Amino acid sequence: MAANNEDAANYLAADEQFEDEAYDSPSPTTSTSYATSIQSYIREGVEENGRKYPSYGRNLYGLPIDEEEQERNEVQHTKFKLIIGDRLHLAPVRQLPSNILDLGTGSGIWAIEAADKYESAIVTGVDIAPVQPTWIPANCRFEVLDIEDNWMFAENSFDYIHARELIMAIRDWDRLIKQAYDHLRPGAYLELGATYPTPTSDDGSLRPDMYLKEVERLFFEMAEAMNASLHAPTLWKEKMERAGFVDVRQNIFK
């Protein structure tokens, strides 16, 4: 779940209070016009069957981005914290980190709580949908970014990269993990988390003919049709090690 990087990478984008050390340096004019041009249509999204879906990103994303989904996202956040002992993460973040990145930040709740916890750091949450709140800690920011594209951050810049529940969003995990590796400072950590969508029961009471198992089958079928493998978490450790991470640890909870 967490991995240590021996050979790493630089990052950030600042508001007026903070020094920008994380972005590669596009001109201010280019950055501003880009942000303005994408903002109008990505905020609206695409409506389908009464739900709102993202209109930005190179690949189809199968989950909505509306208010109902943001509420589910926050319940999911609470679930993760309870599972790992009321913590935000398992990886050992260095003292006084300066830059933290949250991939696929969703409602932004993890990034906001991380910014409150690590006041020394600028915590940046990125997502294809700008659905995050505007009232946030001064050291927290949100950016629109498709993390399957090239990242616009300088290499060797992050003290910690966090990603959770991205199995419906990522097609090329090798590329994502390698980009994370390249953007981490030496000794920094990447932490990936996901719910493996295969319900089981210790006592055998969950039979193959039950509706819950049918939901599982349809979920996997849908994901495969989108070319998003739900089996990805079982391969993360191997992919991290192949990218160059060391001290890779896998934690399984039920």
Each model region followed by its residue ranges:
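N-terminal charged/capping segments associated with class I S-adenosyl-L-methionine
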Residues: 2-156, 175, 194-206, 211-214, ...
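A short glycine-rich, Lys/Arg-flanked "PGG" loop and its adjoining helix->strand segment in the class I
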Residues: 174-189
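Short, surface-exposed basic-aromatic patches at helix termini and helix-loop junctions that form
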Residues: 115-117, 182, 240-241
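Conserved catalytic/acceptor-binding region of the Class I
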Residues: 168, 189-254
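Voltage-sensor-like transmembrane helices and their cytoplasmic interface
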Residues: 122, 130, 162-165, 188
